[in-house]
């Protein structure tokens, strides 16, 4: 496929190469064909000038993918890039200063989730923490059993790690979700076994935002002698968490989800729980996680989580008001949609399925209008497959590709809501006017 610029607009033209070897389309060509179909729906009204002179302010509605570093947090980090740049493992003065800063951040993180400082282990982020929790428990406790339980709509960091463990000979059972996006403690009770050593269920879903019954699930796991892990990457800083009261044995988090820096996270490991270490090397993190300590990142994470927790109720009330107004307006103004997920969800999350059109086309058009949203998990947004989460809650496969996630943050405004709804309404109308599926459905209604 070739994108050709013309005086009056843009168009896709097919390449002149002979068919792929064997007569079948190669993977690259299949990708381009999908892009071609989606983009052709919007390029008819787009000119090259639109792209070259687009200077719109971005309206960022993808806070579940990442957040900007808070200015105050950044100011706390900066000294540790230069004048306080010592290695926290060094014994000289600059090293000791760095160690003090790391210890302070460790306490800030621990206090935020009701843990003890010696239960916090810094990592590179959520994916490493998930890998360490799952592989570490599986390998350390396999003599007690080789059965693991998770849910069918976890983050890829959990699902793909479980696949690796299955390849090693572990058995994995998957909890289902109901149409509202919640797993059931009753189902967990029905599938847990004497040889189950770990249950892992995410705290809040990264796509539809539903908050799971963590305390109930942990009670079931413990009643049968299993550990309980939760991927709380989306929840930390947005939901009040008390690992002791909720019975959590291991918890993963990542700073960039609560206005901290990227590349830093941690794994909470309850005292007495001993997963096998994931990364071999030096003796950092009390000899449990090798690698030079990312002091600026750790410092930023500590201050970010402290600020997020201290202002959580106020921020959530503000963000939920934006989200609720957005949802109300979309439901009133755009027909043939599905609002995904139940009421107990993250304050900023709104997830819709728009029937008869592709999510990629919606996102492309919104992007041109300066609106940043997402078709689902940022860690799997390059996949051409429909979202596993959306399929798991019962959205038909033919509709699932039309799903969009909007996630609001504390810098958004009601003006952002109004502008986004206006642009979304125009976008959906125009794309449906060119959709054969929409035309077919309209014709059927007319015949009836």
Q: Model regions: which residues?
A:
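Non-DNA-binding regulatory cores of transcription-related proteins
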Residues: 1-56
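Pyridoxal 5′-phosphate
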Residues: 57-448
């Amino acid at each position: 496929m070739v994108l050709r610029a013309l005086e009056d607009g843009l168009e896709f033209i097919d390449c002149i190469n002979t068919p792929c070897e064997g007569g079948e389309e190669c993977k690259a060509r299949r990708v381009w064909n999908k892009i071609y179909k989606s983009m052709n729906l919007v390029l008819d009204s787009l000119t090259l000038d639109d792209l070259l002179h687009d200077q719109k302010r971005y309206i960022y509605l993808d806070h579940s993918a990442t957040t900007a570093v808070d200015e105050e947090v950044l100011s706390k980090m900066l000294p540790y890039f230069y004048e306080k740049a010592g290695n926290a493992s060094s014994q000289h003065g600059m090293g000791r200063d760095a160690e003090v800063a790391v210890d302070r951040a460790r306490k800030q993180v621990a206090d935020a989730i009701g843990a003890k400082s010696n239960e916090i282990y810094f990592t590179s982020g959520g994916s490493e923490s998930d890998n360490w929790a799952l592989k570490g428990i599986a390998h350390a406790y396999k003599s007690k059993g080789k059965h693991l339980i998770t849910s069918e709509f976890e983050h890829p960091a959990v699902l793909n790690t479980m696949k690796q463990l299955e390849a090693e000979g572990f058995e994995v059972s998957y909890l289902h979700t109901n149409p509202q996006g919640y797993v059931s403690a009753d189902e967990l009770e029905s599938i847990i076994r004497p040889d189950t050593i770990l249950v892992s269920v995410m705290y809040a879903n990264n796509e539809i935002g539903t908050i799971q019954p963590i305390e109930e699930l942990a009670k079931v796991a413990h009643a049968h002698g299993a550990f309980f892990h939760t991927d709380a990457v989306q929840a930390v800083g947005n939901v009040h968490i008390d690992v002791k009261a909720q019975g959590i044995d291991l918890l993963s988090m990542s700073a960039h989800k609560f206005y901290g820096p990227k590349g830093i996270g941690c794994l909470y490991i309850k005292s007495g729980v001993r997963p096998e270490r994931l990364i071999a090397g030096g003796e950092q993190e009390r000899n449990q996680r090798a690698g030079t300590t990312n002091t600026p990142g750790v410092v930023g994470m500590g201050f970010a989580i402290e600020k997020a927790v201290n202002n959580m109720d106020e921020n959530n009330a503000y963000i939920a008001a934006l989200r609720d107004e957005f949802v109300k307006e979309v439901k009133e103004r755009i027909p043939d949609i599905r609002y995904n997920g139940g009421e107990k969800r993250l304050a900023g999350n709104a997830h819709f399925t728009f029937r008869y059109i592709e999510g990629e086309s919606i996102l492309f058009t919104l992007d041109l209008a300066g609106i940043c949203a997402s078709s689902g998990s940022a860690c799997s947004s390059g996949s051409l497959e429909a979202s596993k989460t959306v399929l798991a809650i019962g959205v038909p496969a033919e509709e699932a590709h039309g799903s969009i996630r909007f996630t609001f943050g504390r810098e958004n405004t009601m003006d952002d809501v109004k502008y986004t709804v206006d642009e979304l309404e125009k976008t959906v109308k125009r794309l449906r006017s060119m959709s054969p599926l929409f035309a077919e459905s309209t014709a059927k209604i007319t015949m009836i």
